[in-house]
Amino acid sequence: MSDKIKIPNDNISALLGAIDKKFEDQEDFLDIVQWNLRWFNAMQKDREEKIKQVLSVLNSDIFVFQEIEEKSLDNIAKTLSDEGLGSYRTAYGTTGGQQRIAIMWDMEWVRSKDDIKELFGKNAVTIPSGKDVFPRLPLWSYFYCKSTVSNKRGFDFQLVGLHLKSQMDKSGIGEDELQRTLAAVKLSDWLMKDASNLDSDTILLGDWNEPPEAPAWESFRRLEKEKKVKFLKINDQSNFSHLYYRNRNNPGSLLDLKVITSPYAKELNKVGGTIRWLALDDLLKSNKAAGVVKKIINEIKKEITDHMPVLTRFGLDQKKK
């Protein structure tokens, strides 16, 4: 008889209230937190401590980060491991200078099956002016996730961390949108061809720098219509991850997105989504003055980052295997 393996440090399920019933018996799940840390390096000790505190509460199976200096997460990973919150390892992209993509994973539950590397190469796809459509190359990884059921094999999956071109167009002729559009086309093509060479789920997530309805992502919406990926269905536009402030009803925008392929993978919309600090969440639901909301948002932006961490819980039905 197979028994469920107890997870003593599953803080995320505690924060969410419980493990969803559909995961209690026959299904396994994987928690991934996406977070743009905005120009983070290990010399910023106050920020490092605050970020470490947040990550110690979340202690996700995998974290995908953006705007990271190389090796700057190593101390955080060691501290989390020393405190018994996992056995974390880190990997960094090589492009983006001091604003790289990074992945941190808990080896107690997730193991890499191949070297973590960047896709495509520099200048593999450019716009007419010669600019690379990927200022930071997508960071690819291939993992095995251990099952929470004893005597059962876990599951393999591919994960690609993204940080696509920002909405800064110095030329004034829409080059940034063209870069994002061509990046999406390239990723869609890779997803349908190269990614399918491995018998596994594929997850693309990161800072896309535009909301899911943006024209640039038409290639993914087309694949979703063909039932080859999930995109709009798993990106709740009523949520927000990037902090700016216009008014009480429009405090941010959803720029941190995800795409997933596989008939087995399921995203729990009820519990997935942006993780907000309770103070901010309570304020947005209350009748507090808009000025108070703005003050809290500015404090978060100043102390940590202008992005909220985004949680996605993916599940795999072992009975379908």
Identify the residue ranges that each predicted region occupies.
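Active-site-proximal segments of metal-dependent phosphoesterases and phosphodiesterases across multiple
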Residues: 164-185, 213-215
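Sec-exported extracytoplasmic/periplasmic mature domains
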Residues: 56-60, 77-85, 109, 189-196, ...
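Active-site-proximal beta-strand elements of phosphoester/diester hydrolases
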Residues: 29-39, 114, 154-169, 173
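His/acidic metal-ligating clusters that form di-metal
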Residues: 151, 181-205
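Metal-dependent phosphoester-hydrolase catalytic domains
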Residues: 1-20, 71, 133, 193-202, ...
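Catalytic metal-binding/acid-base residues of hydrolase active sites
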Residues: 38, 68-69, 163-165, 208-211
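N-terminal, active-site-proximal structural segment of metallo-dependent hydrolase catalytic domains
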Residues: 1-101, 157, 184-185, 285-321
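Structured beta-strand-rich core segments of catalytic domains in phosphoester-bond hydrolases
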Residues: 68-160
